[in-house]
């Protein structure tokens, strides 16, 4: 089974982050500065042996590759940041492209949202997200295709796989993806596979899904929406529509503004880990093209502080049990051979398989044991 873990590349210094958050800023700054918000809340999370790594260091990428293979992760889905010709955090993947020693399959998720200071509570938009026209789409394609042609890039039936974080914010979605399909065939591929990661897009039948091949049931976001779907439904939809208009018109991403009040109103600021997994393991696939997902844990208080959301009750033992059941469902209910995992290294949002001081290699061992138990270890 192809177990693909989402991977955040913000573990190295870049000039834009230095300018807005201070010299030397990386995701580790938020992780180190995290504070417990209530009794029993474990923060800060500390990497095992204080391994606050630099992702530009080759030894780090080799270590991550070896760890993933040892414990059964098939590949990484790296977040890719492209703003109408400008890029952020691109260097680690460019280094991987040039280094065959890092022999782990990978793919991209285009994190197509504005680069902003929203996690600080400010509405400052540093780099808005616009999409341009065919000229800009071709420029983006020309960058991506170098990776698509790499033997390590994850394909489905020979077609390179590209995940899109938020298709609903792309006004020219159908035209752009249709154009990229043409370019893929011109390059000699049998096509290209587009996957959606957004729960809002997946659950909104008013959107044009015609160019999306598969929908990832991204967790725990889908379970969160499922468990809270009947509370303030009309108000939530109105808010989504207004914010979607602002994003398409001005390139702003203000979705998270007001999230704190909404979570408080719907009692979802401290959700139960077990209830979330119960929903995941009993929910029917949204459609025949749904791809299942697992989540390790969720705690984004390192970024959002008191406005954050903290799931209660996660342990490696529970995760092993739930993950094993999700492997079975992937085969028997979804009829797929691929599952995404939140996440390899989302330390700022509490979703990481990498070892820490509290659980050591517990979550990685849970993955390995569950895969072996189900006869699905990929290596």
Regions found by a protein language model. Name each.
Residues 77, 112-114, 120-124, 141-170, ...:
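Active-site groove signature of glycoside hydrolases
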Residues 26, 36, 96, 342-345, ...:
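Aromatic-rich peripheral "rim/lid" segments of glycoside hydrolase catalytic domains that contact
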Residues 11-13, 52-59, 79-91, 170-172, ...:
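Acidic-and-aromatic substrate-binding clefts and catalytic sites of carbohydrate-active enzymes
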Residues 5, 68, 158, 292, ...:
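Conserved, mostly hydrophobic/aromatic
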Residues 3-7, 15, 172-313:
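Aromatic-lined glycan-binding groove of carbohydrate-active enzymes
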Residues 59-108, 290-292:
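Aromatic-lined substrate-binding rim segments of carbohydrate-active enzymes
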Residues 314-355, 377:
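Substrate-binding cleft of secreted/luminal carbohydrate-active enzymes
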Residues 1-63, 69:
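N-terminal regions that are enriched for targeting/export leaders
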